[in-house]
Curated annotation (Swiss-Prot):
It is found in: Cytoplasm. This is Carbamate kinase. Pfam families: AA_kinase. It catalyses: hydrogencarbonate + NH4(+) + ATP = carbamoyl phosphate + ADP + H2O + H(+).
C-alpha cells in the first residue's frame, strides 16, 4: 500500500518547547519510531511542517544586520534540508540498512495573485505574549495573530497548484525508496513575466500540499498525523465528541477553525473527493491502528453523514 504521511509540527517541536536542535531530533526520533512500525509491506512518503523552524531562521537572520534577511522561500528550502536530514537519519536507524532514502526539495507552484498575499494567516516561528508580539510587529513590520493563548507572526499562505518534482518522487518509489518531500508545504514558486520560475515570500500549508502530493502519487491512504487522537466537535467542552468516520460533504459543514483543525480537514476532504480513497486525521502514536482502520477520523466517500466514537 502506498501511504503519504503528513507530519504535524508537533512531531518536530512541541508547543512552547525551546527550539534547540537536540529537542527537534528527539521529537523526530519519537515520530520515526512510530512510522517504522508501518514500513513493512508499504511504500512510504513523508511530508512535514516547518512553521517553527522557518520562523526561527528568520529571527536568526534578522539578528545579523550586515546583510539583508533571507526570503522565506530560501528559508523554507533550508528547513526542508534540515528536517529531511533528521527524518532520513532517525528512520534509517530503525529500518534495514539496505532500504534507500531520499529527501527531495520540492518546488510548488502558487498563483502570484492568490488573495492570501493580501491576507497573511499562516503562523510561523515561536509563540509570544501579546506585548512581545505587538512590539515585534512594530519593529519588524510583521503581521501578527492570536494562536491559542499566545501570539505568533503570520505570513501569506497561498494554495498549492502544482508540485514540480512529482516525477522524481514516483521514480524513487518505484525503486523501493522511502521519500521525504514537500517539506513545509514545499517551496512556493511562480512564473514571472519572462516565464522564469521564481521563489516568493510565503509558506504553503503543509496539509494542503500533502493532499495534492498524495493525489498526484495515486496514494492508497493519506494520513495527517497530529497530536490529537481524532477530529472533535465541540472541542474543549464537556460535550466534545470524536468523529470516527465522515463523508467529505458532512464534515465540511462543521466549519472547523482556519487556524487549527480547518486546514487538516480541508486537506483530507480534497484527497477523498479527488481520489475516492480514504484520508485519516489522527495521532501519530496510533498510526498502526490508523492503517488498520481502527483509529483516527476517517474521511471517505464510502459513507454518508458522520459517525462518532462511543
Amino acid at each position: 500500500m502506498r501511504i503519504v504521511i503528513a507530519l504535524g509540527g508537533n512531531a518536530l517541536l512541541r508547543r512552547g518547547e525551546p527550539m534547540t536542535a537536540e529537542n527537534q531530533r528527539q521529537n523526530v526520533r519519537i515520530a520515526c519510531e512510530q512510522i517504522a512500525k508501518i514500513w513493512p509491506n508499504n511504500e512510504l512518503v513523508i511530508a512535514h511542517g516547518n512553521g517553527p523552524q522557518v520562523g526561527l531562521l528568520a529571527l536568526q537572520g534578522a539578528a545579523y544586520t550586515d546583510v539583508p534577511t533571507y526570503p522565506l522561500d530560501v528559508l523554507g528550502a533550508e528547513t526542508a534540508g534540515m528536517i529531511g536530514y533528521m527524518i532520513q537519519q532517525e528512520l534509517g536507524n530503525l529500518v534495514p540498512f539496505e532500504v534507500p532514502f531520499a529527501t527531495l526539495l520540492s518546488q510548488v507552484e502558487v498563483d502570484i495573485n492568490d488573495p492570501a498575499f493580501k491576507n497573511p494567516t499562516k503562523p510561523i516561528g515561536p509563540v509570544y505574549t501579546k506585548e512581545e508580539a505587538e512590539r515585534l510587529a512594530k519593529e519588524k513590520n510583521w503581521s501578527i495573530a492570536q494562536d491559542g493563548d499566545k501570539y505568533r507572526r503570520v505570513v501569506p499562505s497561498p494554495l498549492p497548484k502544482r508540485i514540480f518534482e512529482i516525477r522524481p518522487v514516483k521514480w524513487l518509489l518505484e525503486k523501493g525508496s522511502i521519500v521525504i518531500c514537500a517539506g513545509g508545504g514545499g517551496i512556493p514558486t511562480y512564473y514571472d513575466e519572462h516565464h522564469n520560475l521564481q521563489g516568493v515570500e510565503a509558506v504553503i500549508d503543509k496539509d494542503l500540499c500533502s493532499a495534492l502530493l498524495a493525489e498526484n502519487l495515486d496514494a492508497d491512504l493519506f494520513i495527517i498525523a497530529t497530536d490529537v487522537s481524532a477530529t472533535f466537535v465541540d472541542w474543549g467542552k464537556p460535550n466534545q465528541k470524536a468523529i470516527s468516520v465522515a463523508s467529505p460533504e458532512a464534515i465540511s459543514e462543521l466549519g472547523f477553525a482556519s487556524g487549527s483543525m480547518g486546514p487538516k480537514v480541508q486537506a483530507a476532504i480534497n484527497f477523498a473527493k479527488q481520489t475516492g480513497k480514504d484520508a485519516v486525521i489522527g495521532s501519530l502514536s496510533d498510526i498502526v491502528d490508523i492503517v488498520k482502520g481502527k483509529a483516527g477520523t476517517r474521511i471517505t466517500k464510502k459513507t454518508e453523514g458522520i459517525s462518532y466514537y462511543a
